[in-house]
C-alpha cells in the first residue's frame, strides 16, 4: 500500500502539477449544464478541483493524504478559491452534506476491493442522471512506463480497463469510453507517453 503522506512529502512542489486532466476539459465543454455541485475523489493537491472552481463550479474534494490536502488548502488560499476539502479514505467516504450532481475520479488507482467499495458509494450518492467522470492509467500502462517512465502502478488489477469498469458499474450508462496513447506533463509524478483510459457515465 502506498504511503501517500510520505510520497507527497518527498517533494517540495506539486507532485502532479497544476494542469487539470483532460477529462476536466471534456466535462466543462460538453456537460457544463449538468455538473451541479461537483465531488472530486482522490483530489490530491487539488489540480482538478481548482480548475473546476475557476470555471464557476462549486466543489467538494476528498483525499486520504493530509500532506496533499494541506498543500491544496494553501494553494486555494493563495488563489483566493473556496473549496471544501475533507481528509478521508476515498474507498469509503463520509456522508455528504451537499447533494452532488457529478463525481470525478482521476488517477485514483487502488485495489479492486477498494475500487468497488468506492463505486458502490458513488452509486448511492449520485442522483439518477448524475454523471461520473473517470480518467486514469489504462491496462497497457506497465509497458508504456517501462519504455517512457510515465508513472502509474505496475499491478494490472489497479489499472483502468474500460470493460472491467463497465462491468463494475452496471447501474450506469456509458456515454464515452476510450483507451488511448497520450503525452502527460503533470509535474514530476506523471511525465511522458502513457496509456490512458477515459469514461463518462450516467447513473440510471
Task: Label each PLM-derived region with a short phrase.
Residues 129-137:
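Conserved beta-strand signature within the Rossmann-like core of class I S-adenosyl-L-methionine
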Residues 95-102:
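A short acidic, Gly/Pro-enriched loop at the edge of an enzyme's catalytic core
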Residues 72-73:
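Conserved SAM-binding loop
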Residues 65-67:
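Conserved SAM/SAH-binding beta-strand->alpha-helix loop
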Residues 79-90:
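Conserved SAM-binding strand-loop segment of SAM-dependent methyltransferases
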Residues 1-33, 140:
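Conserved class I S-adenosyl-L-methionine
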Residues 110-122:
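A short, conserved alpha-helix within the catalytic core of class I
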Residues 156-177:
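Short alpha-helix
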Amino acid at each position: 500500500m502506498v504511503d501517500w503522506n510520505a510520497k507527497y512529502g518527498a517533494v517540495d512542489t506539486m507532485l502532479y502539477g497544476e494542469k487539470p486532466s483532460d477529462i476536466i476539459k471534456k466535462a466543462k465543454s460538453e456537460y457544463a449544464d449538468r455538473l451541479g455541485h461537483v465531488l472530486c475523489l482522490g483530489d490530491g493537491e487539488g489540480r482538478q478541483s481548482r480548475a473546476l472552481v475557476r470555471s464557476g463550479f462549486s466543489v467538494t474534494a476528498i483525499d486520504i493524504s493530509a500532506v496533499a490536502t494541506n498543500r491544496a488548502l494553501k494553494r486555494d488560499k493563495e488563489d483566493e478559491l473556496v473549496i471544501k476539502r475533507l481528509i478521508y479514505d476515498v474507498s469509503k467516504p463520509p456522508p455528504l452534506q451537499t447533494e452532488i450532481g457529478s463525481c470525478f475520479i482521476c488517477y485514483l488507482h487502488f485495489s479492486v476491493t477498494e475500487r468497488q467499495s468506492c463505486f458502490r458509494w458513488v452509486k448511492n450518492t449520485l442522483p439518477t442522471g448524475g454523471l461520473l467522470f473517470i480518467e486514469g492509467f489504462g491496462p497497457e500502462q506497465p509497458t508504456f512506463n517501462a519504455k517512457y517512465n510515465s508513472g502509474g502502478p505496475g499491478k494490472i488489477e489497479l489499472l483502468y480497463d474500460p470493460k472491467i469498469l463497465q462491468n463494475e458499474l452496471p447501474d450506469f450508462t456509458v456515454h464515452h469510453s476510450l483507451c488511448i496513447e497520450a503525452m502527460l506533463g503533470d509535474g514530476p509524478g506523471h511525465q511522458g507517453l502513457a496509456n490512458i483510459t477515459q469514461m463518462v457515465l450516467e447513473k440510471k
